[in-house]
């Protein structure tokens, strides 16, 4: 579920960035976009940290197995 939330937030940030480039917003729009991006990043950062804490031990455990298959 955390992965889904992170992907969703990344998609929102990408969509906002795309709209900034395509729509050429006014100054008021730029302030709203900056706040939206800041809010999305604040929400995505804790999720990314949780995913990292889970993924790192898995990667450490999988590395010797992968090395054994290759070597």
Curated annotation (Swiss-Prot):
Residues 1-23 form the signal peptide. Keywords: Antibiotic, Antimicrobial, Cleavage on pair of basic residues, Cytolysis, Hemolysis, Immunity, Innate immunity, Secreted, Signal. It is found in: Secreted. It comes from Ceratitis capitata (Mediterranean fruit fly). Female-specific peptides with potent activity against Gram-positive and Gram-negative bacteria. They have as well hemolytic activity. The lineage of its organism: Eukaryota, Metazoa, Ecdysozoa, Arthropoda, Hexapoda. Residues 24-35, 65-71 form a propeptide. Its main location: secreted. This is Ceratotoxin-A. Thermostable. Still active at 100 degrees Celsius. GO terms for biological process: defense response to bacterium; innate immune response; killing of cells of another organism. Disulfide bonds: none annotated. It comes from the Eukaryota. GO terms for cellular component: extracellular region. Homomer of four to six subunits. The gene is CTXA2.
